[in-house]
From Swiss-Prot:
The record marks 112 as: Transition state stabilizer. It is an enzyme of class 3 (hydrolase). Endonuclease that resolves Holliday junction intermediates in genetic recombination. Cleaves mobile four-strand junctions by introducing symmetrical nicks in paired strands. Promotes annealing of linear ssDNA with homologous dsDNA. Required for DNA repair, homologous recombination and chromosome segregation. This is Holliday junction resolvase RecU. The keyword RNA-binding does not apply. GO terms for molecular function: endonuclease activity; magnesium ion binding; nucleic acid binding. Belongs to the RecU family. Pfam families: RecU. GO terms for biological process: chromosome segregation; DNA recombination; DNA repair. Transmembrane segments: none annotated. The gene is recU.
Amino acid sequence: MVKYPSGSLAAFRKPVTTQKKMRTGKRSYTHKKGVNFSDRGMTLEQQINESNKYYLTEEIAVVHKKPTPIQIVKVDYPKRSKAVIREAYFRQASTTDYNGVYKGYYLDFEAKETKNKTNFPLKNFHEHQIFHLAECLKQQGICFTIIRFASLERYFVTPASFVINAWRKAEKSSMTLKEIESHSYEIKSGFRPTLPYLKAVDNFIADRKRE
């Protein structure tokens, strides 16, 4: 039996800081109407995973989803050479969803989605995720969140620095769609791979080089 956590988090009280403020590229790329990623019947995670398989096969990038840590509680040994897990708990993940290497750059990112049409709730980000992204930014990693507006069928690569700054503001409960449009890189439609997010990442990297 696998038991899911209650969702509670031990508070990280260590301040989330970066060595320097990073200006995000205020550029949004036109969304092509008539393209429906959701018609393919896949979740955002499935779309990213399928795209990552394509990138790996084509030797474009090596990006993997980090496994959720499991705490094993009870194990039976019906045979000497075979162990059966009878009870385990999903532990709280301590970092982000994905990481990898692309064109010599270290990538680290989250995948988030919402059914909202005008804003993205910041409560969808946990403190440990914000802390980890901030630490990776200190090492000059390419850090971001792939945000999906499910009702609008729109996808964005949103730089981590923008997300962190928004999350830190106590009075701010969400990022508006307009804010995300102006600070993010919209993912253009594609067939191979399913979600060609690295094209948006290319624009993100290019803007960072110009800063």
